[in-house]
Amino acid sequence: TAADLAAYLAKHSYPLIVVGLPKTIDNDVYPIKQSLGAWTAAEEGAKFFMNVVKENSANPRALTIHEVMGRNCGWLTYKTAQCYRKMLKSMSSRGLFLDDFNLTMGRQDVHAVYVPESKIDFEDEALRLRAVMDKWDSVNIFVSEGAGVKDIIDEMRRRGEDVPVDAFGHPRLDKVNVGQYIGKRFGEMLGAEKVQVFKSGYFARAAAPNKKDLKLIEKCARKAVECALAGESGVVGPDENKAGEIRACEFPRIKGGKPFNVRKGSFRKMLTEIGQPNPRKKRTSR
């Protein structure tokens, strides 16, 4: 938005300094290394799932889907799952699980993480997750709202269904409903007796910033004021091409839709821990 405004003003010879701040919890803006609020959204999404997953303690063969915001980028889904598993490990170390009440780490753990940057192999994953269901009587999946969208849209069109789009021409994800689709498909393949889909989107993005985000916000806000007073336009944030320096990134370099790097070490480590094969790279951030 700031880049569009700056371009419009320049076109009409209007001398005005424009300084923007990157505020998207998807964390998908080039060349911003970390956008404001994304850490908080991941932490709050983890808290959200920590509460709703307790439903599976009272249901046999429970399939629980956590749909996380992220149209084109899986960073938030990855980070939310990572935060959630960190909470689980902390609970385990303090002896807070109650096996006799179906409150076990295995039952509450993340069993699959699906992001837009990699393809979902339903057949292979169903075989793997069926074994998880048989062992724990529960399967929990974290999925980005944009994961597998193309395949779902293709199937909708084959059935003759209309695919509504928003003002920008993007498919309306609330109508495509990735979480419901995955829940229905895996529910049948895993023999689930109860399927529940939860969306943490508004809960996570409406939260007050955590301490880590507050520090980043303060640094960026101070730099933004400095840039404005110095007559320097741009979007202020940690520039991933300048060793993370907080600076006014030039407007021509600003672009949304930066994909999550599925070869990121911590992501691959998490998938290994939960028994999910590492995805083949479709695309990575540059």
Identify what each model region corresponds to.
Residues 1-15, 19, 35-193:
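Accessory alpha-helical/coil subdomains and C-terminal extensions
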Residues 21-27, 118-119, 145-148, 200-203, ...:
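Short, ordered loop/turn segments at secondary-structure junctions
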Residues 26, 33-35, 66, 110-112, ...:
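Generic secondary-structure boundary/loop-capping signal
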Residues 26-28, 99-105, 196-198, 224:
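A broad, low-specificity signal for short, low-complexity segments enriched in glycine/proline
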Residues 31-41, 208-214:
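Short beta-strand elements at the ligand-binding edges of bilobed clamshell
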Residues 152-286:
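C-terminal non-catalytic interaction/assembly regions of soluble proteins
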